[in-house]
Regions:
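Cyclophilin-like peptidyl-prolyl cis-trans isomerases
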Residues: 1-211
């Protein structure tokens, strides 16, 4: 961001009631893909910003913003749906254990191996109240798959929702370019006396223009 690599990049894939993807501008600042980093205090709730990837440890420059609302999350079945999915997946994992098919199964279904049995009630409540995409969290994934969360939209979700509502083609690619003019790193000051370096929502969303 400081080098201006994100300037005039695009939100290249938009899926309403799910997420908006952007920031595809080549390799990472390390010059190569870097490893996933999961934390049981950072979650893919609505407004969370996370690294896009194409598999384990393939993070580069692209990111996404979770856009799913609490209402959509509830309508999709919420925790009951995720728990049912996990019951099915963990049975398959047990069947594939110590099998050459396990690696292939994880590659295909890794993100869905979300161990709802290990998720604290406080985290479940967080998703119920805010929405988001819980199964993308790596901290509670049984096979170490997921997406690295590194920021949170604190202001401007109306802009995220507007981007998510843009007209797209059959592959969820916006018909008109949605341009990220720039991203700036600012110091976010909470109402308390503590401070933390973060990418604020203004840095991510407000400079973005639709059209």
């Amino acid at each position: 961001a400081k080098a201006g690599k994100y300037n005039n990049s695009l939100f290249s894939k938009v899926t309403k009631d799910f997420m908006i993807n952007g920031g595809y501008c080549g390799t990472s600042s390390y010059g190569e893909a870097f490893e996933d980093e999961f934390c049981d205090r950072l979650f893919n709730i609505r407004g969370a910003v996370a690294m896009s990837n194409t598999g384990a440890d393939t993070n580069e420059s692209a990111f996404f913003i979770n856009q799913k609302t609490a209402e959509t999350y509830k309508n999709e079945g919420g925790w009951e749906h995720l728990a049912s999915q996990w019951d099915s997946i963990k049975t398959q994992l047990a069947n594939y254990k110590d099998s050459n098919l396990l690696t292939a199964f994880i590659e295909k279904n890794g993100t869905n191996c979300y161990d709802t049995d290990s998720v604290p009630d406080s985290v479940k409540k967080l998703y119920e109240e805010n929405g988001g995409n819980a199964y993308l969290d790596g901290a509670y994934n049984a096979v170490d798959r997921g997406y690295t969360v590194f920021a949170q939209v604190i202001d401007g979700m109306d802009v995220v929702d507007k981007i998510a509502s843009a007209k797209v083609d059959k592959d969820d690619i916006p018909v008109k370019n949605i341009v990220i003019k720039s991203i700036k790193i600012t110091q976010y000051k909470e109402k308390s006396t503590t401070q933390a370096d973060s990418t604020s929502a203004k840095s991510v969303t407000q400079p973005t223009t639709v059209g």
